[in-house]
Amino acid sequence: NAYNGFNSAPSELHYVLDSYMTALNKGIEVHVCTDIARIENVRISPEYWAKSGLPGAPSLADVTAYTKANGTGYQMHRSDWEYVSDLLVSGYKTGVWIGREPGFADAPNAQLYEVHVDGCGNGLYVEDVNPYGILISNSSFAAGEGDNAVYFYKDFSTSVQFNGVDFNGPIVSDGRDGVISFESCTFNEYPDYALKINSGNVLLSQCDFKKSTGHVYLGADTYTLKSVNSGYKSKLQIDNHSTAADVEVITGKKYTFAPIPKNIKTNIAVHPKPASDNVLKADLARATGYNNNRPTRDVSAELQSALDAVKAAGGGTLYL
């Protein structure tokens, strides 16, 4: 447990793997990451401290009350091509926060896969995204009573795509522009509207609403709603208060497509490892100078000889 779990200051290639934490303030915070970073198999919840058995550990009710009033699970400012997979956040004021660097307009783009958030005030809070956008797939965002599964702040003006995502709770957008798209998504429980789009643009493709009413609310500044085979049994209910929105609803079997597969195993159970700790360095002929210089010598026979030497020594690693 910690006040802050992991903080990435301006840098590149951070890698947070197989981590379980209770952070009272922020679980993971990313600033100005200028090359691909990864968050994989991370759990952020008040229960880890509460159930740790450590001296002075609080009750689950007490620590959850604090994190739900103050905490953020995963906070991503500018990051260029962040990859997040198998992230679970529960019991925080904000589950996942995406937005700008403080005092600047720099924002992230990222791919999120198997991100699951529940019991948070805002499951996902999007302040802003850079022009390359955010893709979120095979994930879920669940809100408590009176909370939002997803919220888009007024600075949002680019692109977020949800594919194969389950929502419990409303999605609310006050973004000034931009496109929010939903493909093969499911909208379960929500109070009045599943989608309350006060401004901006929304696209729906083959989405399933579990209630017969309250699907989409369009505010005065909504520009576009386009829907294909979406709604309750493919019937979409729209409450249109826009001044001039372009609304198009299409249904038909010819527009049906295969949804993104679920429960895909993205990692092998046992990673390969060398038979021994032996390491052999092979210093082979190679190109010199800039990357566009071509090598002139065939080293395949020497490379095979080096591999054979490693094998004869009982296995190991060949370092080039």
Model-based region annotation:
Residues 3, 12-18, 25-27, 36-37, ...:
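Detector for repetitive beta-architecture
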Residues 72, 85, 109-141, 146-152, ...:
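Core solenoid repeat modules with strong leucine/isoleucine-rich periodicity
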Residues 1, 17, 40-42, 46-64, ...:
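Extracellular "leader-to-stem" segments immediately downstream of a signal peptide or signal-anchor
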Residues 1-7, 22-34, 52-76, 91-104, ...:
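Extracellular beta-strand/beta-solenoid scaffold signature
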Residues 8, 21, 30, 44, ...:
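Extracellular beta-strand solenoids
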